[in-house]
From Swiss-Prot:
It is found in: Myelin membrane. The record marks F90, K91, F114, S115 as: Cleavage. It comes from Pan troglodytes (Chimpanzee). This is Myelin basic protein. The gene is MBP. Belongs to the myelin basic protein family. The lineage of its organism: Eukaryota, Metazoa, Chordata, Craniata, Vertebrata. The modification Deamidated glutamine is found at Q103, Q148.
Amino acid sequence: ASQKRPSQRHGSKYLATASTMDHARHGFLPRHRDTGILDSIGRFFGGDRGAPKRGSGKDSHHPARTAHYGSLPQKSGHRTQDENPVVHFFKNIVTPRTPPPSQGKGRGLSLSRFSWGAEGQRPGFGYGGRASDYKSAHKGFKGAQDAQGTLSKIFKLGGRDSRSGSPMARR
């Protein structure tokens, strides 16, 4: 029992405080950029829906690139251009895991922040945990280690791309 309790507490504590920990401890890492994305996404889910569609049809590819790697906080004033592709990218990641559509803003912000934060710190927690669950469920108990080997390969090889592709491919 004494072994079980700390691990459980640690698990739930991590889940509960993932976003705050990220911002406090890792503010200086690239994650700092993501807050720009997350903010605009929160606004998008909150009701900016009409604005991004207006001028962004043609530009959608380039802003998506700059948005992910570059100057989000400065750009967020320009939301008509970079929001649409960015949000599209995030929706693909976030939607499979969001049961309550009613939450709106909270959904976009907390969910995407949690998944980014978690996988930044410990690949096993975000999609990693889920993917290995699925895989080990199929293969049985022996497959659990296999699944993790595969996962680390995926994370090393494709990083962001393979991860955003896999949940969609699976569903």
